[in-house]
Regions:
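A conserved mid-protein helix/loop that constitutes part of the nucleotide-sugar donor-binding site
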Residues: 13-21, 190, 194-213, 227-234, ...
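Membrane-proximal helix-turn-helix segments that form the acceptor-binding/catalytic region
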Residues: 73, 127-146
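A short, active-site helix/loop in glycosyltransferases that binds the activated sugar's phosphate group
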Residues: 140-167, 175
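Aromatic "clamp/platform" in nucleotide-sugar-dependent glycosyltransferases that forms part
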Residues: 250, 269
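Conserved acidic donor-binding segment of nucleotide-sugar-dependent glycosyltransferases
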Residues: 301-302, 306-313, 322-328
């Protein structure tokens, strides 16, 4: 079976990691082809897997009508040339243009939603545009199926009437397990870690304002890169917490960094089902996160971590203070999170559920045996 995967940007993010886990998890019965808008992290890693990688330069994130039309035409040509059995799109922009192109070529198409473009927290004009585009895509293409990475996203789509329930399936993100590298309680002073790109969505500002009121010794490690990095660094100096904060940049040793930390935080304004939280749970870390998107489907209040409202400086501070002050609490919540990861969010579970979605479109005889032994 041949699958064409389409995504807009190749940057290092949750959607890209999810896509790599899919492409690396299929047996030799699957031939994967990747189409993305530029060279970057994703194309480099895909080529290491032996994936046929195509750059479609017109496939860009900003809305540009002429360029978007060219991207649509380019994807149609690519579909005709590669003759995939399924087109599988990731991210909102690729999800719209890719579905249009696949349906025009009469190829079954899957769209994985890594958070809707009309999520709460996104600016009103973009929410309206995202909602209209999803209504449009749902109506022009009948031979499609939508994968939501969280039940919350599926419920939101039903509420907004963008897709019928029978055309959607929740497949939680899953990642490969790795051995615990070290005791999460080895740090002195304790290390708080956040792994996220420096974008408005991740709201590093709230986290910095929260730690400005914390007492005692601790370190905050911020892993990632992005356009707001310098702005966040300046805010850390303005708040007088720069000595507590380490900006580590984009890293390829995140499991090691998590193994040396004592607790994980994610202060996002909106999310789908964050892979970064799964990585923290895999490492046995308790999690403090904002209650957005599908976050509460992995962070169980008082069991695997604590939930706060978006932009709730005091709430983040209280949760961090409780965990910093109590090593036994960190161990209990982190251990429960680790067990939940093993039980529910492994890579194989994700692959099996994704294969079942493919089977709905092309038949079980085409998808039997496509999941590798992982």
């Amino acid at each position: 079976m041949r699958i064409l995967y389409v995504i807009t940007t190749p940057d290092h993010g949750g959607a890209q990691v999810n896509l790599l886990d899919l492409m690396s998890g299929w047996s030799e019965r699957v031939e994967s082809i990747l189409a993305t808008g530029a060279e970057g992290f994703l194309t480099e890693e895909a080529r290491k897997l032996g994936v046929d990688t195509r750059v479609v330069p017109e496939l860009v994130r900003p809305v540009r009508l002429v360029t978007d039309w060219r991207a649509y035409r380019s994807l149609r040509r690519l579909i005709r040339a590669t003759k995939p059995d399924i087109v599988h799109c990731h991210s909102s922009k690729a999800g719209l243009i890719g579905r249009m192109a696949a349906c025009a070529e009469r190829v079954p198409v899957v769209f994985t939603v890594h958070g809707w473009a009309f999520e709460h927290g996104i600016s009103t004009p973009w929410r309206i545009m995202g909602l209209l585009s999803e209504h449009f895509a749902a109506r022009i293409c009948r031979n499609q199926h939508v994968i939501t990475v969280a039940d919350a996203d599926k419920r939101l789509a039903i509420t907004k009437k963008v897709q019928p329930a029978e055309r959607m399936t929740t497949v939680h993100n899953g990642i490969p397990d790795v051995p615990l590298r070290a005791s999460p309680e080895g740090g002195d002073p304790p290390t708080i870690i956040m792994v996220a790109r420096f974008f408005e969505q991740k709201d590093h500002d709230t986290l910095l304002r929260a730690i400005a009121g914390l007492e005692g010794a601790f370190t905050l490690s911020l892993v990632g890169d992005g356009p707001r990095l310098e702005q966040v660094a300046a805010l850390s100096r303005e708040l007088g917490v720069a000595d507590h904060v380490a900006f580590l940049g984009d890293r390829n040793d995140v499991p090691d960094l998590l193994a040396r930390a004592q607790l994980f935080v994610l202060s996002s304004l909106w999310e789908g089902f964050p892979i970064s939280i799964l990585e923290a749970m895999r490492a046995g870390l308790p999690v403090v996160a904002t209650d957005v998107g599908g976050v509460r489907e992995s962070v169980i209040e008082g069991e695997t971590g604590y939930l706060t409202n978006p932009r709730d400086v005091d709430g983040v501070r209280r949760a961090l203070a409780m965990l910093l002050a109590d090593a036994n609490l960190r161990k209990r919540l982190g251990g429960a999170g680790r067990q939940m990861f093993v039980d529910r969010f492994g890579k194989r579970q994700m692959l099996v559920r994704t294969a079942s979605v493919y089977a709905r479109l092309v038949g079980e005889n085409r998808t039997n045996g496509i999941v590798a032994e992982v």
